[in-house]
Regions:
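Long, compositionally biased intrinsically disordered regions
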Residues: 1-3, 37, 91
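Short, solvent-exposed loop/turn segments that connect beta-strands within catalytic domains
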Residues: 70-75
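Short, amphipathic alpha-helical interaction segments positioned at domain boundaries
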Residues: 77-93
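Short, locally clustered residues in the helix-turn-helix/winged-helix DNA-binding domain
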Residues: 22-29
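Short alpha-helical segments that sit at the start of domains
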Residues: 1-21
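Short acidic, hydrophobic short linear motifs in intrinsically disordered regions
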Residues: 29-41
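A short, conserved structural fragment
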Residues: 57-69
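Short amphipathic alpha-helical interaction segments
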Residues: 43-59, 76
Length: 93
């Protein structure tokens, strides 16, 4: 799947989103990470985290398994990096 990935698409992901993606990559596969833990690992504020997660979901680099739930001030309950997200980071990171 990474073969069809355009590096320009990855470069368009802003630095905040890359910071979140890198933080998520430190956790085990399949582990769901809540916004507060992302905040602790990155130092980003909730608004920045929400925007980054939205961008990463659109790029298929992360998933929000239960999109109908959220845990304010975050627009999601938990998030996990996809295998595709890990591959992109490994190759282009």
């Amino acid at each position: 799947m990474v073969k069809n990935f355009d590096l320009e698409d990855f470069n368009m992901v802003d630095m905040t989103a890359k910071k979140v993606l890198v933080a998520l990559s430190k956790f085990d596969r399949g582990e769901l990470i809540k916004g507060e833990l992302i905040h602790k690992k990155t130092g980003l504020i909730p608004v920045e985290i929400n925007e980054a997660v939205r961008s990463l979901v659109k790029s298929l680099l992360v998933e929000v398994p239960d999109a109908l739930k959220n845990l304010p001030p975050y627009d999601f309950y938990a998030v996990e990096i996809t295998d595709f997200g890990r591959q992109v980071l490994e190759q282009y990171g």
